[in-house]
């Protein structure tokens, strides 16, 4: 079993990809929502760390970033944003060093 996250959620051919993988390799992929992704991230972190007080978990991926506010009892709030490292890089369309304008672009996309 596999899980598809932001790249497959946003792909025009995501369902076709899932079908092709299953037919050719035999692996069933489930495309999960950003909310489900945040839940799984929390479970993974919780499995590794037994935090007794409030915690903020951040997962920066290629196509999305999840923020999870949690405490010892569970998730208090979770948000998934379509801002990931690969997505920002593609929007910048750069192969060399970033300029001051590139950093402005990144700030606008992250903070607005």
At which residue positions do the language-model features occur?
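Nucleotide/phosphate-binding catalytic cleft detector across ATP-hydrolyzing
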Residues: 1-57, 68-112
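Active-site-adjacent helix-turn-beta-strand microarchitecture at beta-sheet edges
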Residues: 64
């Amino acid at each position: 079993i596999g899980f598809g996250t932001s790249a497959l959620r946003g792909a025009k051919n995501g369902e076709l990809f899932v079908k092709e993988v299953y037919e050719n390799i035999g692996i069933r992929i489930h495309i999960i929502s950003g909310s489900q992704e945040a839940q799984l991230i929390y479970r993974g972190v919780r499995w590794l760390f037994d935090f007794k007080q409030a915690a903020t978990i951040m997962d920066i991926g290629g196509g999305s970033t999840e923020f999870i506010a949690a405490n010892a009892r569970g998730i208090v709030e979770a948000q998934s944003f379509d801002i990931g490292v690969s997505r920002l890089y593609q929007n910048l369309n750069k192969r060399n060093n970033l300029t001051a304008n590139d950093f402005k672009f990144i700030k606008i996309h992250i903070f607005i």
